[in-house]
Amino acid sequence: MPENSKSGGINIYRYNAEKERLDLVHEVGHLPLTDATIVKFHSDEEFVFSTKLPNPNGNEWEIYPFDGKFMKMEAKALDTVSFPSNIARNAGDSFYIGEQMYRPAQDCNKCYGNGINIQQVNSVGGKFELKTVNEFHSDNPDYGLGYHTFNIKNGLIVVDGHRYRFPRIVKLLHILSKLK
């Protein structure tokens, strides 16, 4: 599902190879969700994990029931997890190691995607519990703004860092702004 929070809804598209475009299939749900992911939890229940506007980089993570057969989600959150800091926003798809689900989350305490937290996901009595088991931040000066995506699939890990495209110009503008 592409990021589409500003439109107020999430849509599913199908790639049209003949016309080389994405065709709208239907709206999954009408909520301003950010970096929403569809996950199959241990019991084969499906959920949408997400944060939402107006505080996408905050500390509240929501879980919505999802019907994979009809590709629709419920508008009312099943559960909300509140974190002590701004680490709620998804940073990619959840994944399993053995029977244990993990979720990559963005550390948004300094800025959007400052780093990645890997969180263990459990459900106890119908309530979701998350525990950070690892975190990492960029030590590469070329990607000093951080990491905002972590995906793992078929033995490959993809991490997306972000940076200023023209760091020298940004540094010069920063110096000039202090001269006022």
What are these model-derived regions, one by one?
Residues 1-180:
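Carbohydrate-active catalytic/glycan-binding domains of CAZyme proteins
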